[in-house]
C-alpha cells in the first residue's frame, strides 16, 4: 500500500519478507538493540504479542516477519512515532495483524485486559532520570532516558499483562543487571535466559538480552556471548544472520 511520507521521513528495507519501515533520522531511528532483541526472542504462530514502547514499530514488524504471531500490538506514548508505526504497518499491508496503540506504559494495565498476552517485548529507556538532558521532551531523550517510565513501570505492567507461563523479552544495559534481576523476581517474572552482547571480543559487554517467564521455576541459562563486530564495520556471521542479510 502507498502511504504518505512526512517531511524528513524515509523508507528503509528491513531485509525480512520484503518489509519496510518509515523513519525520520532527525527524530529517532531504530537501533541494533531492537534487532538483536527480535533475534533473541521466540514466539509461536498462535501467540498474541505486545511490544511496550514500540517507537516506530520495528519490533512488531520483525516479530511478524519471523514468527507470524496470530496478532501483535505495539504501545507507544509519542504520537509522532505511533503515527509512523501505523503507516509502516499499512505500507506492509499488515493492518489485520498488527495494531499500534497510542498510550502510556504506566497505563498499559488499564488499556489492555489482564493476562492477555503470550509474549511481551520491550526495548526500554536505559538511562536513569534526566541527568545531562537539555530537553527532556525531545523524542530521542524520551526513548533513551527514564523520563516517562521507569524499569519498574515496565516490569510491573508486564507482570499484569502476561498470561501465566507467558514470556517476557527485554534488552537493557549490563550496568543495571542487578536491579533488573531484583525487579523481575519481585514481580514473579522468573529470569530464564540471558545473553551478554559485546561490541568486540576484547571489549566489555554493552547490552544484555533477558528472557523471563511469569510464574516460572527458578533456573536460568546463560547463553554464549554474542559478539557484534569481527573488525570495524564488519559484523560477525551471527549478526548478519539476525539481520537477515
Q: What is each residue range found by the language model?
A:
Residues 124-153:
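Mobile active-site "lid"/loop adjacent to the S-adenosyl-L-methionine
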Residues 22, 99-101, 192-195:
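General small-molecule cofactor/ligand-binding pocket signal
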Residues 40-133, 156:
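Conserved SAM/SAH cofactor-binding pocket of Class I
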Residues 66-67, 113-114, 202-206, 220:
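A generic structural micro-feature
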Residues 2-45:
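Class I SAM-dependent transferase core
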Residues 15, 43, 94, 185-188:
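Short, structurally constrained coil/turn elements
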Residues 204-245:
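SAM/dcSAM-binding transferase cores
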Residues 148-199, 203-205:
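Conserved Class I SAM-dependent methyltransferase catalytic core
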Amino acid at each position: 500500500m502507498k502511504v504518505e511520507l512526512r517531511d524528513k521521513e524515509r523508507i528503509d528495507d528491513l531485509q525480512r519478507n520484503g518489509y519496510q519501515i518509515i523513519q525520520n533520522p532527525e527524530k529517532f531511528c531504530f537501533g541494533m538493540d531492537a534487532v538483536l532483541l527480535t533475534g533473541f526472542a521466540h514466539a509461536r504462530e498462535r501467540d498474541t504479542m505486545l511490544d511496550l514502547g514500540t517507537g516506530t514499530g520495528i519490533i512488531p514488524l520483525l516479530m511478524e516477519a519471523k514468527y507470524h504471531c496470530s496478532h501483535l500490538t505495539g504501545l507507544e506514548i509519542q504520537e509522532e512515532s505511533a503515527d509512523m508505526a501505523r503507516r509502516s504497518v499499512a505500507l506492509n499491508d499488515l493492518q489485520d495483524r498488527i495494531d499500534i496503540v497510542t498510550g502510556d506504559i504506566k497505563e498499559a494495565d488499564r488499556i489492555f485486559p489482564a493476562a492477555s498476552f503470550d509474549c511481551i517485548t520491550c526495548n526500554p529507556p536505559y538511562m536513569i532520570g534526566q541527568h545531562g538532558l537539555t530537553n527532556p521532551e525531545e523524542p530521542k531523550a524520551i526513548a533513551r532516558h527514564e523520563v516517562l517510565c521507569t524499569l519498574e513501570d515496565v516490569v510491573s505492567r508486564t507482570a499484569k499483562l502476561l498470561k501465566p507461563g507467558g514470556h517476557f523479552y527485554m534488552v537493557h544495559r549490563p550496568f543495571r543487571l542487578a536491579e533488573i534481576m531484583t525487579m523481575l523476581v519481585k514481580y514473579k517474572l522468573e529470569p530464564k535466559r540471558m545473553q551478554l552482547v559485546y561490541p568486540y571480543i576484547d571489549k566489555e559487554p554493552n547490552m544484555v538480552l533477558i528472557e523471563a517467564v511469569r510464574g516460572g521455576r527458578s533456573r536460568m541459562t546463560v547463553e554464549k556471548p554474542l559478539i557484534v563486530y569481527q573488525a570495524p564495520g564488519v559484523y560477525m556471521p551471527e549478526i548478519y544472520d539476525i539481520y537477515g542479510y
